[in-house]
């Protein structure tokens, strides 16, 4: 079977759980302390979810779905204009937004095979996707789980 980057990252992030949700309190606290919110994204979140400012900030600072797309990435530029409830219920929406994230961040050249065999590529991908070099080890474990070489 041919495994995809979606398979690898969803295994790392949520074990494939489309409805996974993680609030990132440290990220939220930093934003609150600095007042460092992208108001256009907040407006997009409020419009799509018909919610309060406080709820929009929670959505902004949470990661959503099988591959844990951060709310601020999900609603960047208004490209996704449905509620997070719709996002969590629909794998096609999640795959599409994952692809959009990869494209926006220059990560489309990475394949499971490359991540399995090239440590430098794995570390680079990990730093962009999750920010932590230790994330590269989790990617390798997922590749090994699926037998990707």
UniProtKB/Swiss-Prot annotation:
Inactivation temperature above 4 degrees Celsius. Keywords: Antimicrobial, Bacteriolytic enzyme, Cytolysis, Glycosidase, Host cell lysis by virus, Hydrolase, Membrane, Viral release from host cell, Virion. It catalyses: Hydrolysis of (1->4)-beta-linkages between N-acetylmuramic acid and N-acetyl-D-glucosamine residues in a peptidoglycan and between N-acetyl-D-glucosamine residues in chitodextrins. Its main location: virion. Optimum pH is 7.0-8.0. It is a peripheral membrane protein. GO terms for molecular function: lysozyme activity; peptidoglycan beta-N-acetylmuramidase activity. InterPro entries: Muramidase, Phage_PRD1_P15_lysozyme. Its EC number is 3.2.1.17. It comes from the Viruses. Disulfide bonds: none annotated. GO terms for biological process: cell wall disassembly; defense response to bacterium; viral release from host cell by cytolysis. Belongs to the glycosyl hydrolase 24 family. Endolysin involved in host peptidoglycan digestion after permeabilization of the cytoplasmic membrane by holin. Involved in host cell lysis and liberation of progeny phages. Displays strong lytic activity against chloroform-treated Gram-negative cells. This is Endolysin. It comes from Enterobacteria phage PRD1.
């Amino acid at each position: 079977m041919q495994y995809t980057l979606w398979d690898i990252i969803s295994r790392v992030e949520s074990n494939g759980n489309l409805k996974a949700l993680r609030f990132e309190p440290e990220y939220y606290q930093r934003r609150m302390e600095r007042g460092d919110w992208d108001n256009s994204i907040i407006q997009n979140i409020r419009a799509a979810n018909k919610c309060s400012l406080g709820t929009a900030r929670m959505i902004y600072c949470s990661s959503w779905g099988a591959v844990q797309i951060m709310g601020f990435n999900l609603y960047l530029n208004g490209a996704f204009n449905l509620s997070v409830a719709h996002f969590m219920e629909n794998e096609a929406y999640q795959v599409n937004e994952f692809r959009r994230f990869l494209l926006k961040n220059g990560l489309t050249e990475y394949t499971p095979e490359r991540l399995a065999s090239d440590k430098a590529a794995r570390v680079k991908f990990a730093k962009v996707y999750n920010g932590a070099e230790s994330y590269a080890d989790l990617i390798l474990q997922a590749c090994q789980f699926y037998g990707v070489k």
